[in-house]
């Protein structure tokens, strides 16, 4: 039995599992297997081969840049370069279709511009490349790839050393000297992942519990840092803390305690895996007493590796409400699972996002450009979507602005059609008749024969609490937050007039397009209730309790 203390407090219980918990644990593992949570040995071997190839490509990249800066051949060879992994792959909780979070570490003479130009060009020449999108403006600049059937997210960190040998580790804090914040954030991923595995009592128990929580979070659409929800590392740290509190528990018990504890957690009390470390470097460490910005974090989960950062800084008022509601639901279901009234499959039931709200905003990013350039544009829009959510949250009458954590994409051949007509039709049920007259293109390959328009849409659900104005009409004005969002997007270096487009439109529940529902899912029905009309002094008929969307329309597609 493990009696060691892990974390910042004594454990709550050091008891081992009960017979019932062991039975529930076996059922959990079986449910995870049934849902394809574990990858085959052959698929895992392929990941290793791809990472081995990328190690060679990184060394080629560093060598090429070194030679361009007049280094001798031997010095350029010695400059090195190394690939590290982090996230779900390094934690050992990846499954079929999971991406590989990959860190490229380079010596001081290689720049981030080199990463997005020289290295990206080296990758483009590879026959295994299927898709590439460079997003240099992201909070952590990133290259997103589909490579030989595997999704890879590449980030870069430049160390203040002349060479990066293959035996380099990232444990030494002195490696963090004289780095900018982007490099620190990039390095933190691998360093945090390694520390998490060292701070849990039983890694196998932790990994199975984390697989469960990851699957739950994905099914309930509360997984995605960029959208304002915890990402993979944050969920991992939340699970790890429960493992510390119950060091001898099995995974099923960890999951039950997870929901019970975090439903009652006194936010914004931080979740810590170990005490926050000070260090000799002039780098910022998370400290709400010192930094006002850190006091704004709503559900802080603090990384264990120095310098400690908040992994959940993106959580907004709206996404916090959604997360807490899902934790509460999970806690209730776990009680029923324990009582034998429900099974693990009930915990993993799919979300109801596209049934939940009466009104939605649909944000459309469109490009008359290559697949790569469109991914760059839509990736930028995605990275800024949280800014729109923050602006909507403070609009009068908006209780919740709930972003959906996945996008939907289509490509059409333009022919003689007007791009704005296509954009105006995209994302709504009523626009689908027009879109069916177009030739869709399933291929992301670029060709000169056809001019294509590529579209990606994102949805934000709106929970509204509107008060009546003097004329008895309920109104919502979101012109200002939408106009501000347009300004941010059009001010980007990714935006080119006439090539890139951005549009925000209001969509009622019954007007959502068909592609947001899976085969077999029933669409929500339009209410047959008729609304009372009133005659205004100007003689115009208006609907009493008018839909707030009608006064909130903000369409612009240039």
From Swiss-Prot:
Q: Which residues bind Mg(2+) 1?
A: 99, 101
InterPro entries noted in UniProt: NT_sf (IPR043519), NuclTrfase_I-like_C (IPR011068), PolA_pol_cen_dom (IPR007012), PolA_pol_NTPase (IPR048840), PolA_pol_RNA-bd_dom (IPR007010), PolyA_polymerase (IPR014492)
Give the cofactor note text.
Binds 2 magnesium ions. Also active with manganese.
Instruction: Please give the Pfam families that the UniProt record associates with this protein.
Output: PAP_central (PF04928), PAP_NTPase (PF20750), PAP_RNA-bind (PF04926)
Q: Keywords on this record?
A: ATP-binding, Magnesium, Manganese, Metal-binding, mRNA processing, Nucleotide-binding, Nucleus, RNA-binding, Transferase
Q: Which GO terms describe its molecular function?
A: ATP binding; metal ion binding; poly(A) RNA polymerase activity; RNA binding
Q: What is its EC number?
A: 2.7.7.19
> Which cofactors are named for this entry?
Mg(2+); Mn(2+)
**Main EC class the enzyme belongs to:** transferase
Instruction: Locate the compositionally biased regions of type Low complexity.
Output: 547-558
Residues that bind ATP: 86-88, 99-101, 153, 214, 223, 232-233
Catalytically driven reaction(s): RNA(n) + ATP = RNA(n)-3'-adenine ribonucleotide + diphosphate
Q: Name one GO cellular component term.
A: nucleus
Q: Where is this site: Interaction with RNA?
A: 144, 313-314, 386, 391, 484
Q: Where is the stretch described as Disordered?
A: 1-20, 516-558
Residue ranges, compositional bias (Basic and acidic residues)? 535-545
Give the residue spans that cross the bilayer: none
Residues that bind Mg(2+) 2: 99, 101, 153
Keyword Magnesium attributed: yes
Could you state one GO biological process linked to this protein?
Answer: single-species biofilm formation on inanimate substrate
Q: Where is the composition biased (Polar residues)?
A: 1-17
Any other noteworthy remark?
Answer: The C.albicans mating-type-like (MTL) locus contains, in addition to the genes for the regulatory proteins (MTLA1, MTLA2, MTLALPHA1 and MTLALPHA2), a and alpha idiomorphs of a phosphatidylinositol kinase (PIKA and PIKALPHA), a poly(A) polymerase (PAPA and PAPALPHA) and an oxysterol binding protein-like protein (OBPA and OBPALPHA). PAPALPHA is not represented in the genomic sequence of strain SC5314 because that haploid assembly includes the mating type a allele of this locus.
As for family, the record states: Belongs to the poly(A) polymerase family.
Q: Which purpose does this protein serve, as stated in its record?
A: Polymerase that creates the 3'-poly(A) tail of mRNA's. May acquire specificity through interaction with a cleavage and polyadenylation factor.
Q: What is this protein called?
A: Poly(A) polymerase PAPalpha
Q: Which organism is it from?
A: Candida albicans (strain SC5314 / ATCC MYA-2876)
